[in-house]
Swiss-Prot record:
Gene that encodes it: KEX1
Annotated protein name in UniProt: Pheromone-processing carboxypeptidase KEX1
UniProt organism field: Ajellomyces capsulatus (strain NAm1 / WU24) (Darling's disease fungus)
The UniProt record lists the keyword Kinase: no
Gene3D superfamilies named among the record's database cross-references: alpha/beta hydrolase
Source species taxonomy: Eukaryota, Fungi, Dikarya, Ascomycota, Pezizomycotina
One of the GO biological process terms: apoptotic process
Cytoplasmic topological domain: 539-634
Length: 634
């Protein structure tokens, strides 16, 4: 021990407890100082000037020990209807990023081939806040220590509840929103488990704020593996992919026979994945192999190079993947550059660990959710094969809940299929009974909103109860069995002056509530730390004066230019001196903010953030391996 260190130790011996307590509080203060403003996305490269879109993005730690962080991307609603609503969107995989949903499906923007962002007609942020989350840990921009990946659905749901608790601490005014979950494919497993976890959490007592879960939507869901496996060959026959009585059909039927044996032996209604049954779909795809082409399993109207067979689809992926790797984009989204997470559409490491061997399939949770009063909407794109509509329709037909089977209205009487006409075109059909709604989209793929943003938005607004008759705007012409439902707007933004004034009042109220809630917590921590610090300094000075020492701070040997945590804390809030988490930004701030338009030239001049080769190839090697597993759905 050197002279200065020894002197400091003698000077502050007996103060280690005080020092430990203070440092712990200082650390807590630094953590609590992380606020919504730190996540604010000022602009994105290539973002259009209008309409203004308020966004927040970044990582939230859900487990310090394993460095488990989930990435979120929040998009605020353009307008508030009768009440605020938040839709949480999850893509599937397992291990596929929800940026697919954000930039190719329901989000406000699509990426062009010159790295600009175009606004999407029919995006879901018109009357609902959107929250995209990369989960489980390790998916997309999320990260976790090696070996700490999630393997079961219950564990995934528990981690997601932890994420929501921390997210609502940052954005407290959203905690009182009506809450909906939406997603597709393997999210058909995620979402019912998360819904179950939320309903169970709400029963734990009055100390917790009850989250107002109002419904879930699942598109082309991997919900009942048994029904889906058994639907592959009937779907192939129905769509003319395989002809009965041919050598092709015999080869596929042989694979199906092995699958049936496995299903019967294991009685595996309670199994999420059966490798022997995965071979049925692969056999069908192999029968379409001609030259170097094969059928696209996500949209059977298309072909792809063999053996991708749909893995290169949708075409927007070619633009989106490099965009999400540009340094200026990752910086705008507050990606933790120290972790070098990069971005890939699907993670082989996540899917390799997430086998759900001990988890029952989510179809077994649906009856209980429905009977507890949770509305559920299942929708299917007609031209998807991997999670095709026959499998989902069969699971509904066999499911029992609330005293009936399937869409029974009474014993032997089923709810009719109601024709859906959207803006003069036959769009599909609706069928509903006892809290469950099913929608089939004609001529749509595995990713319905990719094909039909306005139609999918109309479905959402109808499900969550938006009626623009109260706020102004041009309603869409959408009719079910010839009858118009609530007025919904899928293109034109409401322009009612009265609506704008009402919305401004709601924004102001929500903003101040958010300030009060987050401010109270920070004030308490600051007050406690200040009191302890003051007592510590006073007692130390008294002791030192008695001993003839001069007080110079906690670590006098460091001199006056300390780089400790407290000086850094003064800059934690970044460029803004206040929290910008409220539903919308002050009009004055919008006026002062520079234009968000970034020219194609300036966007291209930015150095791309490339994971892997200099050519910016799409994904790492484990991604292609993962997507070859047919159970892995985007």
């Amino acid at each position: 021990m050197g002279f200065s260190e020894a002197r400091a130790y003698r000077a502050f011996g007996g103060r280690s407890t005080w020092l430990t307590v203070f440092l712990a509080l200082a650390n807590s203060l630094a953590v609590s100082a992380k606020c919504a403003a730190d996540y604010f996305v000022d602009s994105l490269p290539g973002q259009p000037d209008s309409p203004q879109v308020q966004m927040h993005a970044g990582h939230i730690e859900i487990n310090h020990k394993t460095s488990a962080n989930l990435f979120f991307w929040h998009v605020a609603n353009q307008h508030i209807a009768d009440k605020p609503r938040t839709v949480i969107w999850l893509n599937g995989g397992p291990g596929c990023s929800s940026e697919d949903g954000a930039l190719m499906e329901i989000g406000p923007y699509r990426v062009t081939n010159d790295h600009l962002l175009n606004h999407t007609d029919g995006s879901w942020d018109e009357f609902a806040n959107l929250l995209f989350v990369d989960q489980p840990v390790g998916t997309g921009f999320s990260y976790v220590s090696t070996g700490a990946y999630v393997s079961e659905l219950g564990e995934m749901a528990s981690q997601f509840v932890t994420f929501l608790e921390k997210w609502f601490e940052l954005f407290p005014h959203y905690e009182k929103n009506d809450l909906y979950f939406a997603g597709e494919s393997y999210a058909g497993q995620y979402i019912p488990y998360i819904a179950r976890a939320i309903l169970d959490r709400n029963k734990k007592g009055e100390s917790l704020t009850r989250w107002k879960l109002k419904g879930i939507l699942i598109g082309n869901g991997w919900i009942s593996p048994r029904h889906q496996y058994l639907s592959y060959l009937p779907y192939a026959y129905q769509e003319g992919i395989i002809q009965g009585g041919t050598d092709s059909s015999s080869r596929v039927e042989a694979k199906l026979s092995k699958c049936l044996n496995k299903l019967n032996v294991e009685d595996s209604t309670g199994t999420v994945q059966i490798s022997a049954c995965e071979e049925v779909l692969q056999a069908i795809i192999d029968e379409t192999h001609k030259g170097n082409r094969c059928i696209n399993m996500y949209d059977i109207r298309l072909t792809d190079e063999y053996s991708a067979c749909g893995m290169n689809w949708p075409p927007d992926l070619e633009n989106m993947a490099p965009y999400l790797r540009f340094k200026n984009v990752t910086k705008a989204l507050h990606i933790n550059s120290d972790k070098q997470t990069g971005w890939s559409e699907c993670s082989g490491a996540v899917s390799g660990h997430f086998r759900a061997l001990k988890s029952k399939p989510s179809v077994e949770l649906l009856p209980g959710l429905l009977e507890e009063g949770l509305p559920i909407l299942l929708f299917s794109g007609q031209k998807d094969m991997i999670c095709n509509h026959i499998g989902n329709e069969d699971l509904i037909k066999d499911m029992k809940w609330s005293g009936g089977t399937g869409f029974e209205l009474s014993p032997g009487v089923w709810a009719p299929r109601q024709d859906w006409i959207f803006e003069g075109e036959s769009a599909g059909f609706y069928q509903q009974a006892r809290n469950l709604t099913y929608v089939l989209f004609y001529n749509a793929s595995h990713m319905v909103p990719f094909n039909y943003p306005p139609r999918s938005r109309e479905m959402l607004d109808r499900f969550i109860g938006v009626d623009i008759a109260d706020i102004g705007g041009n309603p869409a012409d959408s009719r079910i069995d010839g009858e118009k439902g609530p007025a919904t707007s899928v293109r034109a933004h409401p322009n009612s002056t009265a609506a704008a004034e009402r919305e401004k009042e709601k924004v102001k109220s929500a903003m101040w509530k958010a300030y009060y809630k987050s401010g109270e917590v920070a004030l308490i921590v600051v007050a406690i730390a200040a009191v302890i610090w003051g007592v510590f300094i006073w007692r130390s000075r008294q002791k030192h004066q008695d001993r003839g020492y001069e007080f110079r701070g906690i670590y006098p040997m460091l001199g006056s230019s300390s780089s400790g945590s407290l000086p850094r804390y003064s800059n934690k809030r970044g460029r803004r001196g206040h929290d910008v988490e409220a539903v919308n930004i002050y009009e004055a701030e919008l006026d002062e903010r520079p234009s968000r338009v970034v020219s194609a030239r300036s966007s291209r001049e930015q150095e791309p953030y490339v994971v892997g080769d200099e050519d910016g190839s799409d994904v790492d090697d484990d991604t292609s391996d993962e997507r070859k597993r047919l159970v892995d759905k985007p």
